[in-house]
Swiss-Prot record:
Pfam families noted in UniProt: SDF
GO biological process, alphabetically ordered: L-cystine transport; sulfur amino acid transport; sulfur utilization
Gene (UniProt): tcyP
Family: Belongs to the dicarboxylate/amino acid:cation symporter (DAACS) (TC 2.A.23) family.
Protein's job: Involved in L-cystine import. Low affinity L-cystine transporter that is mainly involved in L-cystine uptake from outside as a nutrient. Is the primary transporter at high concentrations of cystine. Probably functions as a proton symporter. Can also transport D-cystine, cysteine and homocystine as a methionine precursor. Mediates accumulation of the toxic compounds L-selenaproline (SCA) and L-selenocystine (SeCys). Can also transport S-sulfocysteine and is required for growth on S-sulfocysteine as a sulfur source.
Disruption phenotype: Disruption of the gene decreases uptake of cystine. The mutant cannot grow on S-sulfocysteine. The tcyP-tcyJ double mutant is unable to import cystine. The tcyP-tcyL double mutant cannot grow in the minimal medium containing L-cystine as a sole sulfur source. The tcyP-tcyJ and tcyP-tcyL double mutants are completely resistant to both L-selenaproline and L-selenocystine.
Recorded catalytic activity of this chain's protein: L-cystine(out) + H(+)(out) = L-cystine(in) + H(+)(in)
Entry's localization field: Cell inner membrane
Membrane spanning stretches: 1-21, 33-53, 73-93, 106-126, 185-205, 264-284, 347-367, 370-390, 395-415
Name by which UniProt lists this protein: L-cystine transporter TcyP
Origin species: Escherichia coli (strain K12)
Amino acid sequence: MNFPLIANIVVFVVLLFALAQTRHKQWSLAKKVLVGLVMGVVFGLALHTIYGSDSQVLKDSVQWFNIVGNGYVQLLQMIVMPLVFASILSAVARLHNASQLGKISFLTIGTLLFTTLIAALVGVLVTNLFGLTAEGLVQGGAETARLNAIESNYVGKVSDLSVPQLVLSFIPKNPFADLTGANPTSIISVVIFAAFLGVAALKLLKDDAPKGERVLAAIDTLQSWVMKLVRLVMQLTPYGVLALMTKVVAGSNLQDIIKLGSFVVASYLGLLIMFAVHGILLGINGVSPLKYFRKVWPVLTFAFTSRSSAASIPLNVEAQTRRLGVPESIASFAASFGATIGQNGCAGLYPAMLAVMVAPTVGINPLDPMWIATLVGIVTVSSAGVAGVGGGATFAALIVLPAMGLPVTLVALLISVEPLIDMGRTALNVSGSMTAGTLTSQWLKQTDKAILDSEDDAELAHH
């Protein structure tokens, strides 16, 4: 073991201990996460300045930090399936009639796809506005290696899925395999399976009340139990964020970021426009955008740092029910669907931007209205199966680009700035699903106005 490596690990452990002292304070989770975020950025910058992003010491150190960072993300992935299963099951079992189920899913999914369609258009717009193209981005050895890795990872799962097959892959044939997250579309399959189970519980309640009551009591117990598990993992968020931010900041190559600067700026401009679109949609439907963003801010910061839409599901549901007055049934649906269907950032904005950048290299005019219409259509439809765990955007791009007959090499070239942009995209995905839930709740006139209008915001889960 070399000395610098040990020193880095010691400093990291000291930072974790320092962060652990915040548990004695009456701080909200959002505040602790913010402290972790700042510490991670500062520590990451220090490491970057001392060692430079390519040094072996730094790479070795990051592997140790990953125990905390990636370990945390894996714990989040651990709770996603039980959470989606329990939330949807209890949400459906609480509906008094199964006909509401159709309405809720139709409106939620409709809103998600509609916002993704707008996001794709915004992506086309900003990319053309900045005149970004893939020409002149050099493919070095590192990129080629990355491309091969990406292709072997994803392409087998994606490229042979046509749209009908994609839709078919949502329907669960082995719910236990889907609970293991075996397929990219597992989350949706679990949602469908849980919804069926919930409807069956309602039918049972009608036909045989005592048994039905017992099943519903069991479902409620399961839901409370899983939520306790979720809170446990949530308490680790600040530490995970500290480690993840250290890794992103220390390992990001400044030359790459400057070289791809216009892409980063264009991406964030597109993201800001989409946040404005969410605000406008809410405003039209009687929810003050400022109030909405103030109330969901902790969830967005969490999504931003964790870079996982699926991992944000627990906080997402909490914010909708306890701050925006959305009933639990709608909130659980919007959060679970939103982690897979119609992610505005990862599956809407990003693939559209990439397609517009690649088009000129193969002699397609990216301003051609027919081409744009086809692109937006394909992006919207294929956004239905992007798994909500980090790297979903790469996945979306690998569905959209081949479908448009475009090469996928650009995906590898942009990977160096991927984490930087992915943070903003994930926040947008999560805002999209909360917007869908809030709008659905408004349309069905089920919003609890007292909660929505209250100025003091319920503290989001952290005990």
